[in-house]
Amino acid sequence: MAEVPARWLLGLVFIWMGLSKALQPVEFLKLVRQYDVVHGTLLLNSIAAALPWFEILCGGLMVAGIAVRGSALVLAGLLVPFTWMVLHRALALHSNVPFCAIRFDCGCGSGEVFVCRKLLENAILILVSIVLVCGRGRKCCVRYELV
């Protein structure tokens, strides 16, 4: 029974974060660029344009209860490398500042965040995603799996 609120929470978080990025694509592009992972203008622009809508789509599928396992797997697949990049960037910024006092706009759509809080938040979202991928709760689902 806890899978339904977990599914709705995960879906709404991604809808909210995706919308905040989609409504400010230029700002999101700048934040993607700061990680210095992707090179090439076309690829950067494509990521900044498509990723927010992909997050909104997966979040909407979660809330609606359509393809829950696949959507949860995709969201976990987005969260794991993003969390790694946030950690890597925080470690690069960590000089004379205590680690948990580091703040920056990570690009998740919630503005400037403390790194320890963001890492904990992402770890919880990853765990919720894994529970939904491995779980079999079908309550309030339109279609749990596509296949």
Q: Where does each model-flagged region fall?
A:
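Extended, low-polarity transmembrane helix blocks
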Residues: 1-26, 53, 60, 64-147
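Solvent-exposed, well-ordered loop and adjacent helix/strand elements within mature globular domains
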Residues: 17-51
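Membrane-helix exit/interface motif
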Residues: 33, 58-61
